[in-house]
Amino acid sequence: MKEKVVLAYSGGLDTSVILKWLCEKGFDVIAYVANVGQKDDFDAIKEKALKTGASKVYVEDLRREFVTDYIFTALLGNAMYEGRYLLGTAIARPLIAKRQVEIAEKEGAQYVAHGATGKGNDQVRFELTYAALNPNLKVISPWKDPEFLAKFKGRTDLINYAMEKGIPIKVSKKRPYSEDENLMHISHEAGKLEDPAYIPDEDVFTWTVSPKDAPDEETLLEIHFENGIPVKVVNLKDGTEKTDPLELFEYLNEVGAKNGVGRLDMVENRFIGIKSRGVYETPGATILWTAHRDLEGITMDKEVMHLRDMLAPKFAELIYNGFWFSPEMEFLLAAFRKAQENVTGKVTVSIYKGNVMPVARYSPYSLYNPELSSMDVEGGFNATDSKGFINIHALRLKVHQLVKKGYQK
């Protein structure tokens, strides 16, 4: 009886060759296709997998779970890798790998496989998730397998093999970039972009218009949150209202994209140590992250906010590096959910030519006291108390300066 392997399958050249290669090695290959919002023909992908040799194909729509359990969860900690990247690819991988493990368990498969390369982050994200959720599963990673590497030294070898085995391949001109698309973002890498000094042509971008070509009129959105989670968005100009999580996020993508929001060009540090340039388009999440952070300004205690902000870079790093299912992630999420208990209210954002600008906010749990903050009203605050406050905080500075002068003599 053949041993079963569940392959994370995209329908592209790499995973199609891997599927056939696994079949020829004697495996019963079950292809698993995850719909996380990429614009693919899933019926065609399923047909291609079956023709290539898969005994069964799972095509699953994970978009809603991606939004509610992954994107919105990352929002709780304002996850942003190296202060800039909103982690669109990294957030999707644990969801895909989790479902792959569940299918393997359902099918009684002994193996799981993926087509991630040996230089990138995705190999780590997939395999750490496998290990965390089912340590008994064996992993087949062809791009780290000596036999596979000896047979396929590059794209030409893959194409020749596909043609030899009758695997359908696209003959149309391919975009000269490596791209990953899901509901949260689209990323562009490789090709000319590997030169960090190269200024990308406008044709790199496929989701967003250039801010220069965006409408000359602002869009005002009112975004509502409950305990840090988005629950409603209202367009204050045309009255459009969305409350369903998936529809809400798709609408923010639509509004952000046509207003040139969410473009990012950066060089980042991959987990394995290689620096990589990525060009990203993340319109909807950029709007959400900005609005959410603004609401925290009036609802979160100062020290809680600052402590959370100290932990946020670690949170983003864990997501980026593939530790979504880990004890430290459970710890951080428990803390973040506690910190978000009063992050309830609404924020109005002005969206204009690539910018997302909060212009108003309200919360029933607001810690903002107009009288205390007023420049005109004393409001129960005794200004003379500040003298002692400053003296106490100045004490160590005075001592430090006296000692410093003493050392200089």
Swiss-Prot record:
Gene3D superfamilies: Argininosuccinate synthetase, chain A, domain 2, HUPs, Single helix bin
Positions annotated to bind ATP: 8-16, 34, 115
PROSITE patterns for this protein: ARGININOSUCCIN_SYN_1, ARGININOSUCCIN_SYN_2
Ligand binding (L-citrulline): 85, 121, 125, 178, 187, 268, 280
Keywords: Amino-acid biosynthesis, Arginine biosynthesis, ATP-binding, Cytoplasm, Ligase, Nucleotide-binding
Pfam families according to UniProt: Arginosuc_syn_C, Arginosuc_synth
InterPro entries: Arginosuc_syn_C, Arginosuc_syn_N, Arginosuc_synth, Arginosuc_synth_CS, Arginosuc_synth_type_1_subfam, AS_cat/multimer_dom_body, Rossmann-like_a/b/a_fold
Protein EC: 6.3.4.5
One of the record's GO molecular function terms: ATP binding
Leading EC class: ligase
The keyword ATP-binding is assigned to this record: yes
Domain of life: Bacteria
Subunit structure, interactors included: Homotetramer.
Family affiliation: Belongs to the argininosuccinate synthase family. Type 1 subfamily.
Protein name, per record: Argininosuccinate synthase
Gene, per the UniProt record: argG
